[in-house]
């Protein structure tokens, strides 16, 4: 399998079909699982670090928080589960934890639980869990035929941010420093909270965070979840010039790669 979230077809075939008691939270296109506890509805989401680069702790934390925002929630609780190789240096572990703590603190939260295990793994494995309180719940069942879907944000912000971080020196050989510096700052646009805060005040039916697989995958997931087709006007999908330039250098389709920072509404 390719690196990243598995395909919608593989998820249905090898995950959903193997689970007997199917919760509504297990559907394709669900960003966060809702759980009602008396008069409070909690929303839960998780993510794992798939690529290591400068600032990856902050980036993957933001992806997880975005799932909570898109689910109509407000994050309250952050938990980390970390698996490290037996010979992993304690100083390296400390740097990772410090990076997470700085990112969490900057976002107005705190790490409430952190488990670290040393074992037979070849690299560090980190799972990020976030629990929030749902301020407004949405249901895929409300999506009917002829429903309009709009995208807030711009495509492939996540991919542009990651690739620039990984290949900064190579890009500086090809582009002016000002351009590369701008691409590095694109990570500042991965937070969708302002978008979802505005959307929640409107009469919307559903929100879906564009993430792994890009805007095409996100649109397909929404359509597949409600068993409907979808028509996309590609000319109306916002894309920045920085994204186009980076995609051309590394020969990938910006419509089909990490779109963290955009939301389908």
Positions of the model-derived regions?
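Helix-biased detector of long, well-ordered alpha-helical tracts
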Residues: 1-264
């Amino acid at each position: 399998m390719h690196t990243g979230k598995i395909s919608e077809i593989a998820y249905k075939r090898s995950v959903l079909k193997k689970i007997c008691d199917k919760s509504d939270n297990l559907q394709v296109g669900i960003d966060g699982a809702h759980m009602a506890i008396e008069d409070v509805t909690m929303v839960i989401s998780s993510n794992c670090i798939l690529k290591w680069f400068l600032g990856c702790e902050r980036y993957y934390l933001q992806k997880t928080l975005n799932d909570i925002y898109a689910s109509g929630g407000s994050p309250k609780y952050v938990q980390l589960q970390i698996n490290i190789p037996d010979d992993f240096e304690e100083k390296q572990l400390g740097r990772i934890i410090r990076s997470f703590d700085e990112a969490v603190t900057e976002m107005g939260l705190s790490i409430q639980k952190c488990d670290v295990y040393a074992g037979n793994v070849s690299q560090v494995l980190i799972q990020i869990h976030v629990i929030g309180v749902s301020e407004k719940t949405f249901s895929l069942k409300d999506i009917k035929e002829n429903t309009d879907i709009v995208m807030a944000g711009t495509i492939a912000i996540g991919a542009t941010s990651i690739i620039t971080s990984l290949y900064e020196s190579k890009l500086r050989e090809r582009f002016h420093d000002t351009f590369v510096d701008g691409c590095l700052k694109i990570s500042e646009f991965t937070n969708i909270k302002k978008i979802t805060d505005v959307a929640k005040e409107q009469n919307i039916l559903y929100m879906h965070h564009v993430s792994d697989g890009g805007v095409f995958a996100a649109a397909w997931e929404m359509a597949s979840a409600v068993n409907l087709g979808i028509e996309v006007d590609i000319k109306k999908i916002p894309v920045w010039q920085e994204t186009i330039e980076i995609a051309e250098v590394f020969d990938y389709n910006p419509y089909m790669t990490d779109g963290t920072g955009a939301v389908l509404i």
